[in-house]
Amino acid sequence: MSAADHLMTVHLVSMGCARNDVDSEELAARMEAGGFRLVDDPAEAETVVVNTCGFIEQAKKDSVDTLLAAADLKGNGITTSVVAVGCMAERYGRELAESLPEADAVLGFDDYGDIAGRLRTILDGGSLETHVPRDRRTLLPISPVDRPTARAEVSVPGHGTAPDLSASVTPDSGPRATRRRLGTGPSAPLKMASGCDRRCAFCAIPRFRGSYLSRPIAEIVEEARWLVDHGVKEVFLVSENSSSYGKDLGDLRLLEKLLVNLDQVDGLEWIRVSYLQPAELRPGLIDTILATDKVVPYFDLSFQHASGPLLRRMRRFGDAESFLNIIDSIRSRCPEAGLRSNFITGFPGETDADVAVLADFLQRARLDVAGVFAYSDEEGTEAAGLDGHVDEDVVTARREDLADLTDELVSQRAEDRIGTRGRVMVEEIDEAVIGRAEHQGPEVDGCVTLVDAAAVSVGDIVDVEFVGSDGVDLVARPANA
């Protein structure tokens, strides 16, 4: 049976972070350009493609469960194949294929450019060579400034160009991008860079995502225009480390210039920057974020802990006082700015005193959102081989205590906003009008319920007064109501 005899339907499941969502939209564009039709119901798809997450243990378990659930559809008379792509597939490759025979193929990032061809081979009954993992840091030059010229030889998801795509996916004229929107909301992630040059002891991401590689400003701006043409009002700039943007393009302050260029995109209302490294958060970048009209005052800061000695053990920089100085610097200029971060507890060598330092920092920092994660060993990381591993039950107890503390603190921070004014982007109108304020990132930072807001549409930005809170979520009414 040839591919011409097939339905050529595919269902794509995107797991994990916003960076993976961008990769999924690239895959969707390439599959559609290759003759496949995307369907919302997996039971109607001949092929189910799962864009997996390989970051932490729970994410890997969720990815495996999703692949197994997709494989269960094979008896429905329509679904014939299940394909694993994404970070878990890239990271484990053959090992994943051997442990999960229910998947018909495990493909790596190098397969993305011809993903449609790979799927046609599977439909025709052919077999594909299972991806063999390699350290992707070795694919680009060690020197960052030498990487742009080598970029064309390496497959980097989210860095694709569009000349090979049909007009049904991206137009012959106007802004072009190698992506097909899978959502309809007014906000969309926009990848500004990939990979990471840091060597955090707990993190395996650089091994399978590779060395840091920035996208040129013109390419990002073009994609932003394309997103606006497809209904987007807010772009959420994503990468593994946004504050390093431009290091490989010869300009360590290129992020400031990118924000100014994006500010000129007609129809774009909000620009949001994610995942900033505190050690690289320079005063000029803070100034640009706070002074550029469309850039929302939002700081996603990767603290990870607050104990200086433990951060050194993590191969990171900073301590509670230096982090508080950053926060004070931001809030002295913009008291309403949103600040969020994530923290790891239970890292090898963490003591009760370290936990006390972190708890004290959280109380003094008054973050809008704080996530607390229990440390777990990741294969191939320095931390997995360290001494001083903390007993699992102790790690669990520490995480629960810190999570309870952060829940209380972020609720208090939300209460502090009652009586103040802000702006809210409307995202959903159903039984209630739901949106997000400038200090709230997509999906993870809570929402705002708008009351007395009858004449609004999705994508509208409304001046509001905050009148109530429920945990991290807020209630607001139009300021002129």
Curated annotation (Swiss-Prot):
Q: What is its main location?
A: cytoplasm
- Write down the top EC class of this protein: transferase
Any idea which positions bind [4Fe-4S] cluster 2? 196, 200, 203
Q: Which GO terms describe its biological process?
A: tRNA modification
User: Which E.C. number(s) belong to this protein?
Assistant: 2.8.4.4
- Superkingdom of the source? Bacteria
What subcellular locations does the record give? Cytoplasm
Give start and end of each Radical SAM core domain: 182-413
Please report which protein family the annotation says this sequence is part of.
Belongs to the methylthiotransferase family. RimO subfamily.
PROSITE patterns for this protein: MTTASE_N (PS51449), MTTASE_RADICAL (PS01278), RADICAL_SAM (PS51918)
In its UniProt entry, the species of origin is given as Cutibacterium acnes (strain DSM 16379 / KPA171202) (Propionibacterium acnes)
Q: Which InterPro entries match?
A: Elp3/MiaA/NifB-like_rSAM, Methylthiotransferase, Methylthiotransferase_CS, Methylthiotransferase_N, Methylthiotransferase_N_sf, NA-bd_OB-fold, Ribosomal_uS12_MeSTrfase_RimO, rSAM
Q: What is this protein called?
A: Ribosomal protein uS12 methylthiotransferase RimO
Which cofactor is essential here?
Answer: [4Fe-4S] cluster
| Domain TRAM as annotated: residue spans | 415-480
